[in-house]
Regions:
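Generic serine detector
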Residues: 6, 19, 77, 105, ...
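Charge-rich, low-complexity N-terminal segments
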Residues: 1-72
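Short, solvent-exposed recognition patches
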Residues: 47-140
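A short, solvent-exposed beta-edge/loop patch
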Residues: 31, 35, 123-182
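Generic hydrophobic secondary-structure signal
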Residues: 17-33, 69, 90-92, 100-102, ...
Length: 182
């Protein structure tokens, strides 16, 4: 009886190993036939043209968006929050894949700028970009260029070097806000 039990025990282990090999072979075949592109960029670009057109009719300030950036720049995020200070956001990766964002809001600059620039501080310096005087803010994580406007603030911020922030600020174009319907 012990010989029969021993033989059954060995068969059970052998059957388990064979089953595992069959399952692994099936998984390998399935993996081979699933399409994949190892060279594809994992960061998806977003098209912000529809959101921009919508926000330009809804926002109470001239909404800024870049025009003419090099093709290596990639828009990665877009949103508008009409509840939280009419906040407009466009996120980009520059040619070196560093983050640059355009932020606009009617929230007071003293509150808004440190929030979107991850606690950057005003240096007291300014820089003229495309004929406009931008405040220079610097921080541990992000630097920022800040353009105070009438009832709103525009911020170009991110982890990218200052040259990329300046390039974005120079590319920004605005259209006046839509007139309210009467």
């Amino acid at each position: 009886m012990d010989a029969v039990a021993s033989k059954r025990g060995k068969q059970t282990v052998r059957d388990m190993i064979l089953s595992t090999l069959v399952i692994a072979a099936c998984a390998g075949v399935i993996y081979l036939f699933i399409p994949k592109d190892e060279h594809a960029d994992p960061i998806k670009a977003v098209d912000f043209t529809v959101e921009l057109a919508t926000v330009r009719t809804a926002a109470p300030y001239p909404v800024a968006a870049p025009e003419g950036l090099p093709k290596e720049w990639k828009a990665t995020s877009v949103r508008y929050d009409d509840v939280a200070g009419d906040a407009w956001h466009l996120g980009f990766l520059d040619a070196d894949r560093r983050y640059v964002a355009v932020e606009q809001s009617t929230t007071a600059a003293g509150t808004y700028v440190p929030e979107v620039s991850r606690k950057a501080k005003d240096t007291g310096r300014t820089e003229t970009v495309a004929g406009r005087e931008w405040q220079v803010w610097e921080g541990a994580k992000y630097d920022a260029l800040v353009l105070p406007g009438e009832g709103h603030t525009t911020v170009v911020t991110g982890s990218a070097p200052k040259e990329s922030l300046v390039e974005m600020a120079a590319a920004l174009k605005t259209t006046p806000p839509a007139s309210p319907a009467s």
